Amino acid sequence: MEKVSAFIIAYNEEKLIERALKSLKGVVDEILVFHDGPCSDKTLDIAKKYTNKIGILPRKGRAALHLIAAIKKAKNDWVFKLDADEFLSEELKKNINKLAQDKEASAYTFRWPWRLNDEYITKDWPIKKAMFRKSKCSFIEYPGWDEPRTLGKTINTKYLLEHRPNKGIAYNSLSSFIEKALGRYGKSQARYTLMPFSSFETYQYDKKDFPIITRIRRKFPLVSAPLFSIVAFGKILFKHNVLREGSPVLVEAVKTSIYYLFLGYYVHVLKQGRNLEKVFPKNKLN
């Protein structure tokens, strides 16, 4: 019988992490918790009630930058990546081990609908690839590489992966978008984009360079930004059924297109040798 390892990468999540851990207890074979840098609240004390497999990793500010370390520590081939503000629905808890027995499956996606306070505002969108085989996945330790690229069959399930942040808003509000996406995340990704490929840790990645989109953005940041922005806008609208899910999909398409415009300009600014924090001060975009 194939078993499942689940891991959480957290940063001072004492208000949320116990709910996530409770949903895993008695369901998966192994629970691992990793903290992004030193912990200043009770996150790790809470985690110790559920597992002794706890690690404190160097502070990097993005969970994606710790995924390879977490995957390597998991003992089972099947891994489940859970955020501290997520938890398994009852239906998913009952079926997760059954999913692991499918020999043809390499990964599973789950419904991850947006919520506003206590109500869902989408039904079947977005979806999240949270469960996958270590032997079939590949990663680059790169901001934004939050989901694995997997070989083989990915099965889109109807099971619900609950996402309920402490603020009660399970999607990027405008203020969050400006602060995180256009601020910290956008600037971070721009800096990483210009780093040499050899400086990145990889996991089962069979190429000798970044994906083509990243290479184009590195070389032609300003020219490519509008193109990537338009493509992302159209892809989200048509791939994620805007007619069924409504305005949240449209809003996400607009935000993503804006993000790609800013990202291209951030890369351009850095290539000129200018300081991003002077061009875009923290009190404006971060």
Task: List where the protein language model places each region.
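Conserved donor nucleotide-binding strand/loop of the catalytic core
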Residues: 29, 44-73
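Short aromatic/hydrophobic "clamp" motif used to bind/position activated sugar donors
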Residues: 79
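Catalytic-site signature of metal-activated, phosphate-bearing donor transferases
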Residues: 64-71, 89-270
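Cell-envelope/extracellular polymer assembly enzymes that use nucleotide-activated donors
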Residues: 3-5
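Acidic helix N-cap motif at the loop->helix transition within catalytic regions
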Residues: 18, 39-50, 91
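Juxtamembrane C-terminal module of membrane proteins
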Residues: 265-286
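Short, well-formed alpha-helical segments that are part of the catalytic scaffolds
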Residues: 9-26
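A conserved acidic beta->alpha catalytic loop
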Residues: 23, 33-45, 59, 83
